[in-house]
Every structure is written in C-alpha cells, then in structure tokens.
C-alpha cells in the first residue's frame, strides 16, 4: 500500500467510529485498519495495541513536569498549579467537549481502560510531585500538592463534561479551585 497522509489520525478516527458502533471489546485491529484504508503493519507503527489509540500521545505528565520546574523562582506552588491546569484546559480540551466526553465514556465502560486511566493518574501525580521536589519543596508538601492537583484536574474534567458544551474548561477549573478554597477557609482554627 502506498504512503497515505495522516495515517495516525485516520487510524484514530476509524478506531473511535468502530468503538462507538460495536463496542471496544468487539473491535479488532484488522477492522480498524480496514476502515482507515491502511495495513495492520502501519497500525503497529503508531500504536502498541488498540488500547493505546485511546491513551497514545499523552504527554501531560511531561508537560506538567516541565511547566513546574520551569516556573520562575519564588512563585507559590498553588499559583503554578492553577496556571498549569488552566493552560492544559485551554490547550487540550477547549472546543473538544463532545470528543473528550466520548473518550471518557468509553474509558469508564471498560475495566481494562479504567485500569490504564488509573495508571495515567498515578503517572501525572508522580510527575507533579517529583517536579515540586526538584524545585525544593518538602517531599510531604510536594505529595499533598500533587494529589490535590490531579484531584482538581479530574473533578474539573468531570464537571465540565457533565455541563453545557459552551463552558470553558478553564472556568470549571476556577470553580473547582474556588470550592476547594471555600472548604479550606472553613477549617477550624488550630488550637
């Protein structure tokens, strides 16, 4: 078969169409490649397996690490987190509400995909924690900020996906952060 432009994109579109039509489990790699008009060999140049079609290209942990480590000295860790979450929301999710929602529903429908998603969350948490430790933050504080960052990201993602498509995810990040600050502001004073 001759070289075809945008092979990766064609494979992704074909896979998601088939997942929607017949389900994730029932879809095979040969079906995906036939739909895309490509060979199975081409598929495996881009993806290790069909699961990786969903999770491939996920460089968010590397982006998070670079953003945190590259932030100017003296900036409050929470300000770094907020800026990072807003940036990811705008760069990765804006204008993709329906597409992201379809992927999220697919992930939640399959136990093997939920496991991979949990691994992704852990990888992101580790990347954020390590980056803050590299900035000189105490390891226990870095762990708290990392867990909080990933929790806020996923709460915002879920709230955004269940709301109207016109809402900006960055605005939902701000709402979730406001909710967290409201809870923390109500904490009893230390005795």
Report each predicted region and the residues it spans.
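Alpha-helical DNA-contacting segments of helix-turn-helix folds
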Residues: 47, 51-62
């Amino acid at each position: 078969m001759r070289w075809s432009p945008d092979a990766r994109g064609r494979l992704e579109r074909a896979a998601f169409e088939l997942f929607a039509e017949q389900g994730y489990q029932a879809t095979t790699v040969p079906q995906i490649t036939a739909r895309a008009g490509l060979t199975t060999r081409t598929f495996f140049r881009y993806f290790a397996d069909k699961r990786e079609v969903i999770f491939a290209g996920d460089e968010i942990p590397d982006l998070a690490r670079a953003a945190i480590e590259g932030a100017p000295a003296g900036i409050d860790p929470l300000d770094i987190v907020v800026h990072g979450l807003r940036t990811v929301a705008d760069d990765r999710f804006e204008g993709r509400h329906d597409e992201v929602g379809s992927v999220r529903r697919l992930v939640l429908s399959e136990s093997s995909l939920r496991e991979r998603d949990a691994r992704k969350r852990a990888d992101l948490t580790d990347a954020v924690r390590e980056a803050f430790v590299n900035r000189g933050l105490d390891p226990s504080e870095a762990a708290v900020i990392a867990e909080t960052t990933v929790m806020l990201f996923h709460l915002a993602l879920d709230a955004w996906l269940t709301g109207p498509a016109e809402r900006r995810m960055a605005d939902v990040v701000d709402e979730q952060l406001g909710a967290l600050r409201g809870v923390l502001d109500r904490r009893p004073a230390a005795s």
